[in-house]
A protein has these predicted regions:
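Secretory targeting and sorting signals
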Residues: 1-27, 151
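Noncatalytic scaffold domains of N-terminal-nucleophile
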Residues: 28-54, 66-233, 238-240, 245-250
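Long, structured ligand/cofactor-binding scaffold of large enzymes
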Residues: 58-60
Length: 250
């Protein structure tokens, strides 16, 4: 099943020069040769959010490798980009081993129930598929989130830091807050009707009944506590413990 969000990450380990530059297609569909906009050594981190990127860079500066940085940055995106990332969804982790020139991929997409029938998205009343949007946000589309297990597997196999250490920077961002930008505010505005249906999301994303203003500080103390609880007790706390029970009380 493909429920809520998807998160794709790429971790690259290399000892060669890191060169970053835009790639544009020519009229014939081939990339044009452009002058690099940045050149450096030691590593690079790129995400859609400056706070998450800064977390990844800090991990590298402290001696972590690309996998450590990718996991820490991804966990931070769960705070700053909750509409497209986070432990409530799934995704893929792509790792390139430069020494052996081999690509490894962890499939961490969500899994549906083992008893799920093939026609679960067909309305038995008329034999027609349910409306896509209705089916997407209903209980029919719920799957077991794979993101957290993916991070743990990647960290154990290729990283140099335990998952607990890689979750703590994200927990600090969630507790201290991050600046709201125009994109974050617009994403909340686009989902305001849905957020307004629940007290928890209304309080978090609609303070005073409206999306937070650009430039204000957004905090998520509950997510900070969740990350720290998982860091202290392990991922079983999410999948088999109290956090999981809160997610699925049935």
């Amino acid at each position: 099943m493909r429920f809520t969000t998807a998160l794709a990450m790429t971790a690259t380990l290399t000892m060669t020069t890191v060169t970053l530059g835009p790639i544009q297609a020519s009229a014939h569909g081939k990339p044009q040769a452009l002058t690099p906009t940045a050149t450096g050594y030691g590593g690079a981190v790129s995400t859609v959010d400056p706070t998450a990127t800064a977390v990844g860079l800090d991990v590298l500066r402290r001696g972590g490798n690309a996998v450590d940085a990718a996991v820490a940055a991804a966990a931070t995106l769960g705070v700053t980009e909750p509409f497209s990332a986070g432990i409530g969804g799934g995704g893929f982790f792509v790792y390139y081993d430069a020494q052996h020139k081999k690509v490894h991929t962890i499939d961490g997409r969500e899994s549906g129930p083992a008893t799920m029938a093939e026609d679960v998205f067909v309305d038995p009343a008329d034999g027609q598929p349910y409306d896509f949007q209705e089916a997407r946000v209903s209980g029919l589309s719920v799957g077991t989130p794979g993101t957290l297990a993916t991070w743990e597997a990647a960290a154990k196999k290729w990283g140099t830091r335990p998952l607990a250490n890689l979750l703590r920077p994200a927990a600090k961002v969630a507790e201290d807050g991050f600046p709201v930008d125009a994109t974050f505010r617009q994403q909340i505005a686009d989902n305001a009707a849905a957020f307004g249906q629940f007290d928890a999301t209304k309080e978090l994303y609609l303070p005073g009944g409206a999306p937070p203003a650009v430039g204000t500080t957004q905090r998520n103390p509950d997510l900070a506590a969740t990350y720290r609880r998982i860091a202290n007790r392990g991922t079983d706390e999410f999948y088999r413990g109290e956090i999981g029970a809160d997610l699925d009380p049935v």
